[in-house]
Regions:
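Catalytic cores of alpha/beta
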Residues: 194-211
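Glycine-rich beta-alpha junction loops
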Residues: 2-4, 44, 230
Length: 346
């Protein structure tokens, strides 16, 4: 395999040149992390081969990160010149190296900047308590993790490095609570199974598991995706979705059709094993969950709006009556524009 580019061998990013053509201030957006949040990439790739991930065919389990010193140099420059007060790391996997994370955190201790990144539960769970405490003191406010499912057999089928388990997902949510770092868990519902009854059972199992996680750590952010197949040829999951009747587009023109554009935007899974009733069940649960636990990343919601949403969602959430939550959808549409991190990002 070809070695990934050594970013440390490159000159410093030309922020001033960019500012000449498109003001840097326009890149610094308001998020729950701060008023001027910088989006930054500190590494390339990911060393893992999850069978549902589109990154795998691109990087083929390769990862290479910029040094902590050079990351800090760039951030410090943008902070001093344009007033950046927080950072979103959009790496596919920021936390591959505990050593690099610790070195970066030590440099950030005096900067008073909140930051967010993406990682793996089974990687960060190997970090020492001292490292996690340091990260929080250095401004680490939230970490995005692909929890995916609480079912160990499905996790194995997804090839989550062979290490992540449902029990670990629950335990890790509690561990993050101890260090006041918000775990942002994404789940993928609607995976293929041998029968419609098994698909239904897995959806209900995942819903119950998500509720368990919220009981363990109510601060856990939950993002739900309906499974959209990815062409990761050679994986067990790839073979299974083909056997279940799913067909990928054959040409570039097919991929550009409105049908597949909707698929790419996660609006329509197009999977033959998922019925409209199944998709509706997932979406209705997501609506109720988001009402009961409004995302902390939505800075536009007032305290009153949050309380009203929580009140509307509470009864449905605790009784399991998720179907047809029209009152919640009407509230979200006409009284507030509820933010969706799963499609809008941070």
């Amino acid at each position: 395999k070809e070695t990934l580019l050594d970013q440390d061998a490159l000159p410093q990013l030309p922020f001033d040149e960019l500012d000449r053509f498109y003001p840097m201030q326009h890149y610094l957006n308001r998020t729950f992390l701060g008023k001027k949040t910088l989006a930054y990439h500190s590494s390339m790739g990911c060393p893992f081969k999850c069978s549902f991930c589109a990154v795998v065919p691109i990087y083929e389990a390769r990862w290479r990160g910029k040094s902590a010193a050079n990351i800090y140099r760039d951030i410090k420059y943008v902070q001093e010149k344009w007033g950046a007060d927080s950072i979103e790391f959009h790496d596919n996997n920021f936390f591959v190296s505990e050593k690099r994370t610790v070195e970066f955190s030590e440099l950030m201790l005096r900067e008073n900047m909140n930051w967010w990144g993406e990682g793996r539960i089974d990687t960060v769970d190997q970090y020492s308590d001292e490292s996690l405490a340091l990260m929080r003191r250095a401004g680490c406010r939230m970490i995005f993790f692909g929890a995916e499912t609480g079912n160990d057999a499905l996790l194995k089928q997804m090839d989550k490095g062979g290490k992540q388990t449902g029990e670990q997902i629950r335990r890790f949510a509690a561990r993050m609570k101890k260090f006041d770092i918000i775990p942002e868990y994404s789940f993928v519902l609607g995976m293929p199974a041998d029968s419609p009854e098994q698909v239904w059972a897995q959806i209900e199992e995942d819903i119950a598991f998500i509720k368990q996680v919220k009981t363990i750590n109510p601060e856990t952010e939950i993002i739900i995706y309906v499974y959209s197949p990815v062409p990761t040829e050679g994986s067990e999951l790839y073979e299974r979705i083909l056997q279940a009747g799913f067909k990928f587009p054959a040409t570039l023109e097919d991929w550009l059709s409105p049908q597949w554009e909707s698929f790419d935007l996660r609006r329509n899974p197009l999977t033959p094993w998922l019925t409209p009733a199944m998709v509706r069940r997932i979406r209705d649960f997501e609506t109720v969950l988001n009402a009961r636990f409004p995302t902390v990343s939505d800075t536009k919601l007032s305290d009153l709006q949050r309380r009203v949403m929580q009140a509307l969602g509470s009864l449905r959430y605790h009784t399991g009556i998720f179907s047809f939550p029209y009152e919640i959808k009407a509230l979200q549409k006409f009284w507030l524009r509820y933010r969706q991190p799963e499609t809008e990002g941070m």
